[in-house]
Every structure is written in structure tokens, then in C-alpha cells.
């Protein structure tokens, strides 16, 4: 999160009592022409006489090494002289020096003291930094209400960062009464000034109707504004809108464009969707190598769907050289994250000894993981292995239960096997198996 730093154009506003002297005007003219040595020569006697504007300039020039050797202690000395006379800009800059430990011993309490003095006079940077310190409990007791107060003061002056942070506080109810409408108001103020983070949040709240009337077109508008500034999250979500035709006319080429912008920045969701689009000839033309490339980028970030799809491509030799070991590796990664498709496919590989050492027990374990998530093929295969005692002790009751579940999920072979298994069971065993299946369904 940002902290303000001092900057010449907007921090210093010389008072009329000091700005009209000829020497002061000559000094500022010299400074503006980058004739720093002359400016120092002219500012110094004015500063010694107590001219706060000249004192501020000397503080600035010593701090930045303009016309003199950089000297933080000397900078702090001149800022203090002006600050003690009530100059808000110097108070703020002295607070900055205590914050960084430049020319003075670092002291957060001293920082707060000087920011408070400047903030009470309306110094925007001091107000923002005070809000940040109260929010983080830095130099003061953590106080979200006080933080919100200072953000509001800075936000009312148009500071975009304060407006965004205050919007977040209203959204979460941190330091203020939670109020989505008020949050949306502050996001609008920041977004209208071009802040990408606020524009992204506006896209989200219009998408979901949080604090505003749900409006998909308005959502897309704000995602576009943020996306045009490089916000990867907004780029992905705008791509999804074009993909589905929500708030915009469906346009797969436009969708792929925005996914690519986000994917190039490392957004795994966009990379996954690009992988699917290249695989399925959607928006960019079918290109299995390109598909595998995008799946890999997302898979390496831990995206389970991409890990499964990359495993599938190695399994089938699509866009990559067929490689069962590599396929099993990616299936395992996806399966470890709970992807039922990957668990089932890896179970098949263990059953058949493809890319791994054949292991019926491991096949059963993997089928079970997928079957418990409702994967019909895994349920059917698990039922069959119970029926023949492969990798498990033969158990017709369990076999019947799993085939029953698979059949209820529309698996034809499981339905056929169910009838065969039932022929070897007593009515009591069938009742038990059916009860177990009902329990699983509920």
C-alpha cells in the first residue's frame, strides 16, 4: 500500500506574507530554472530571518541534494524550523523523515505527531499516511475508526488512494458500519479518476449487484477500463463475459484477446481458458500445441483443471509427444487437488500399468476417491473390482452398491453389471446394498 512522498508542485503553498518579497521571487525563479546554487544563496538569508517558505525550500534542497551536498540532518533542521512555525508542508515532510529515519532517529510516535499537525491543516499526504498508520497500528494503537476518519478527509479532497481504501472499509465494515452503497460511492469516485483497482471492483459489484443494481453491461464497461490499464483480473473477467455473451455480444475472438492479455500476465484462469479455446477450436482456431502451452503455464501454477488437461494431452499425444509417465505425473497433481477426472484416469493407468507400475490396490484407491465425488465411470469400475476381487477383497454387496450408484448416474455398463452381480446375491444382501446406495445418495 502506498505512502505519500513529498513532491514540490502540490505540497508547498507559500503564504502571501512571504511570497511577495523580491528576494524570494528571485530565489524561486532561480530554483525553477534549476540554478540551484543561486537559489540556495538567495533562500539562505530569508530562511535565517524566519521565512517559512525559504526554510521549506532549503529543507527540500538539502534532502534532495539540489545545489548542495545531500544532507538529511540539515534538511530536517530547516523543515523543523518551518514546522515549528506551523507550516503544514514542512510538518508533513518532517514526519516523512522521522518515518524513514533520514537525518533523525526513526520514531513512529514523532511521525504521528507531525502528520497530525499537518493533517489538521488539511495536508493531503499527512491525512493519507495517518489513516494508514492507524489502520496498521504503526506508532499508534490500531484504530480502524480513526483510520476511516483520515481516509475520508483525504478522500474528500479527491485523493484516489484514500477513496479506494475507504470504499474497502465500507465494503468490509472495518472502522465504519458496513454499507455496500457507500462503498460503491467511494469506488465510483476513485474509478472515475482512473484508478484501475477501483474500476475492477466496480466491475465486480455491478456483476453481482452489491450496493448497486445488477448491470452486466456496466460491469463490462468497468472491467474494460481496468483491463485497458493492465489489470489482469479485469482482463480475465472481461474475456469471460465475451466468452459467454454476458453484458456484451458473444465474441470468442474478443474473448481470446482478453484472456491472452491476462494470461500473459500470469493469470492461471485465463491461461486455462485459452488452453480450452485452442483445444476446442473456439475463437483462435484449433492449435493443440498452443493449447498444451497454455495448459502447462496454468498447470505449473497449480491449476487442477489445467493439470488434468495437460495429463490428457500427454495421454493421447495431442499437441505433445505421447508420454504415459508425463501423463501420470500431471494426473497425480490434479488428483491430489481432488479432480475426480484425474483420479479416475490415474486409476485406469494403475489398473493397466500404463506410465506407472501396475497396482490394483492403488487403482482401487483412486477409483474410490473419484467415485465418492460422483464420477460414474469410477463408480462402475470400482464396483467391478469389488465383484471380481481385484485390488480388494471380493464383496458383492459393495460391488452392487457402487454399480447401483453408477447406474443411477446413467452408466449403461454398470446397469448391466448390476443385474449380473445381483444373481449371485441373497435378497438380504441386495437390500443391504440398496440401503448403502441410498445412504450415499443422501
PLM region descriptions:
Residues 1, 8-12, 412-442:
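Terminal, low-structured helical/coil segments at or just beyond the last alpha-helical repeat
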Residues 8-37:
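N-terminal leader/linker segments that initiate helical-solenoid repeat arrays
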Residues 23, 30-35, 48-51, 64-66, ...:
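Short helix-capping/linker turns of helical repeat alpha-solenoids
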Amino acid at each position: 500500500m502506498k505512502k505519500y512522498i513529498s513532491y514540490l508542485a502540490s505540497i508547498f503553498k507559500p503564504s502571501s506574507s512571504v511570497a511577495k518579497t523580491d528576494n524570494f521571487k528571485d530565489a524561486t525563479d532561480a530554483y525553477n530554472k534549476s540554478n540551484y546554487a543561486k537559489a540556495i544563496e538567495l533562500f539562505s538569508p530569508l530562511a535565517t530571518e524566519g521565512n517559512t517558505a525559504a526554510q521549506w525550500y532549503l529543507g527540500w534542497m538539502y534532502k534532495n541534494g539540489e545545489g548542495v551536498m545531500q544532507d538529511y540532518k540539515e534538511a530536517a533542521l530547516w523543515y523543523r524550523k518551518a514546522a515549528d512555525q506551523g507550516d503544514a508542508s514542512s510538518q508533513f515532510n518532517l514526519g516523512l523523515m522521522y518515518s524513514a529515519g533520514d537525518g533523525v532517529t526513526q520514531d513512529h510516535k514523532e511521525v504521528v505527531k507531525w502528520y497530525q499537525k499537518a493533517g489538521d491543516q488539511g495536508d493531503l499526504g499527512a491525512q493519507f499516511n495517518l489513516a494508514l498508520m492507524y489502520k496498521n497500528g504503526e506508532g499508534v494503537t490500531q484504530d480502524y475508526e480513526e483510520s476511516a476518519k483520515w481516509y475520508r478527509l483525504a478522500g474528500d479532497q479527491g485523493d484516489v488512494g484514500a477513496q479506494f481504501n475507504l470504499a474497502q472499509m465500507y465494503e468490509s465494515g472495518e472502522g465504519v458500519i458496513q454499507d455496500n452503497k457507500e462503498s460503491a460511492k467511494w469506488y465510483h469516485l476513485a474509478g472515475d479518476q482512473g484508478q484501475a483497482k477501483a474500476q475492477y471492483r466496480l466491475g465486480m459489484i455491478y456483476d453481482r449487484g452489491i450496493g448497486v443494481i445488477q448491470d452486466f453491461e456496466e460491469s463490462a464497461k468497468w472491467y474494460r477500463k481496468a483491463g485497458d490499464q493492465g489489470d489482469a483480473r479485469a482482463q480475465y473477467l472481461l474475456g469471460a463475459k465475451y466468452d459467454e455473451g454476458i453484458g456484451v455480444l458473444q465474441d470468442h475472438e474478443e474473448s481470446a484477446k482478453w484472456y491472452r492479455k491476462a494470461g500473459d500476465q500470469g493469470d492461471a484462469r485465463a491461461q486455462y481458458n485459452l488452453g480450452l479455446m485452442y483445444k476446442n477450436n473456439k475463437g483462435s482456431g484449433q492449435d493443440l500445441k498452443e493449447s498444451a502451452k497454455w495448459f502447462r503455464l496454468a498447470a505449473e501454477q497449480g491449476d487442477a483443471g489445467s493439470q488434468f488437461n495437460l495429463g490428457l494431452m500427454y495421454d493421447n499425444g495431442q499437441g505433445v509427444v505421447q508420454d504415459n509417465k508425463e501423463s501420470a505425473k500431471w494426473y497425480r497433481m490434479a488428483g491430489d487437488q481432488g479432480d475426480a477426472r484425474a483420479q479416475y484416469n490415474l486409476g485406469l493407468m494403475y489398473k493397466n500399468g500404463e506410465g506407472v507400475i501396475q497396482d490394483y490396490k492403488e487403482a482401487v484407491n483412486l477409483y474410490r476417491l473419484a467415485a465418492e465425488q460422483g464420477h460414474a465411470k469410477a463408480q462402475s469400475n470400482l464396483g467391478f473390482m469389488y465383484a471380481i476381487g481385484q485390488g480388494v477383497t471380493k464383496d458383492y454387496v459393495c460391488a452392487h452398491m457402487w454399480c447401483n450408484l453408477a447406474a443411477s448416474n446413467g452408466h449403461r455398463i454398470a446397469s448391466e453389471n448390476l443385474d449380473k452381480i445381483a444373481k449371485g446375491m441373497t435378497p438380504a444382501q441386495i437390500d443391504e446394498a440398496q440401503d448403502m446406495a441410498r445412504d450415499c445418495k443422501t
